[in-house]
From Swiss-Prot:
Record bears the keyword Secreted: no
Region (Disordered): 1-20, 223-274
GO cellular component terms given for this protein: chloroplast; mitochondrial large ribosomal subunit
Protein name: Large ribosomal subunit protein uL2cz/uL2cy
Subunit field text: Part of the 50S ribosomal subunit.
One example of a Gene Ontology biological process annotation: mitochondrial translation
Compartments where found: Plastid, Chloroplast
InterPro entries tied to this protein: NA-bd_OB-fold, Rib_uL2_dom2, Ribosomal_uL2, Ribosomal_uL2_bac/org-type, Ribosomal_uL2_C, Ribosomal_uL2_CS, Ribosomal_uL2_dom3, Ribosomal_uL2_RNA-bd_dom
Molecular-function GO term, any one: structural constituent of ribosome
Length: 274
């Protein structure tokens, strides 16, 4: 998806760089309901993730992460915008009349055909088990649990690499740099997720960020002591602590957030690069 620059007629267009418009389809059976967000609050209404709220109303698009239409060819009918993710989505019409949305693989165009199964060609957009893929294949939408659907490498521009197969496991290098083991029977989609230029997008004005449901970010040092451990003091004051802290008093900037003794610890061969 190309990045579009406007004429510099106003400050917002002068500083903005947005992706070219991919229109949404009219409402169908795969687009339903208002996508209700928690706005960063938990069930008690307490803020657990800051700087979230507002934003435009969204409709949820049901995405087929399982790709369980086995050995039935489908054709890409349209490439559409999805407000719930950075990646674009494709509407697929299968030969048996089924219609589904999938993540848009990079380079796929309207009219291309895709298929999922065990003995299918190694072609962009096709889904098949890791055991049937050659080493070095670029993949996305990777299953962790067999039959649950893809959970890894689903963001815009994400791509993982199959680097080894031994025994019942396959070794993958993920976009974060992490190297981990996954069952060879799990499925993945060949290719890279589209919309790789999303990191070049520049909103240009505060209103555009407000539409996305993101609120302004305020530094803790300018808050009151009741609101943040860094707050308080007369005028410009230091944080008053040896190390920075979160609003709840926990160490910030470098503290590991992964749970200890997690079930997948023995599957991770190398931690992600920071």
């Amino acid at each position: 998806m190309a990045i579009h620059l406007y004429k510099t007629s106003t400050p917002s267009t002068r500083n903005g760089a947005v992706d070219s418009q991919v229109k949404s389809n009219t409402r169908n059976n795969l687009i339903y309901g208002q996508h209700r967000c928690s706005k960063g609050r938990n069930a008690r209404g307490i803020i657990t993730a800051g700087h979230r709220g507002g934003g435009h109303k969204r409709l949820y698009r049901k995405i087929d992460f399982r790709r369980n239409e086995k050995d039935i060819y489908g054709r890409i009918v349209s490439i559409e915008y999805d407000p719930n993710r950075n990646a674009s989505i494709c509407l697929i019409h299968y030969g048996d009349g089924e219609k589904r949305y999938i993540l848009h693989p990079r380079g796929a165009i309207i009219g291309d055909t895709i298929v999922s199964g065990t003995e299918v060609p190694i072609k962009m957009g096709n889904a098949l088990p890791l055991t049937d893929m050659p080493l070095g294949t670029a993949i996305h939408n990777i299953e962790i649990t067999l039959g649950k659907g893809g959970q890894l490498a689903r963001a815009a521009g994400a791509v993982a690499k199959l680097i080894a197969k031994e025994g019942k496991s396959a070794t993958l290098k993920l976009p974060s740099g992490e190297v981990r083991l996954i069952s060879k029977n799990c499925s993945a989609t060949v290719g890279q997720v589209g919309n790789v230029e999303v990191n070049q997008k520049k909103l240009g004005r505060a209103g555009s960020k407000c539409w996305l449901g993101k609120r302004p970010v305020v530094r803790g040092v300018v808050m009151n002591p009741v609101d943040h451990p860094h707050g308080g003091g007369e005028g410009r004051a230091p944080i008053g602590r040896k190390k920075p802290a979160t609003p709840w008093g926990y160490p910030a900037l470098g503290r590991r957030s992964r749970k200890r003794k997690k079930y997948s610890d023995n599957l991770i061969l190398r931690r992600r690069s920071k």
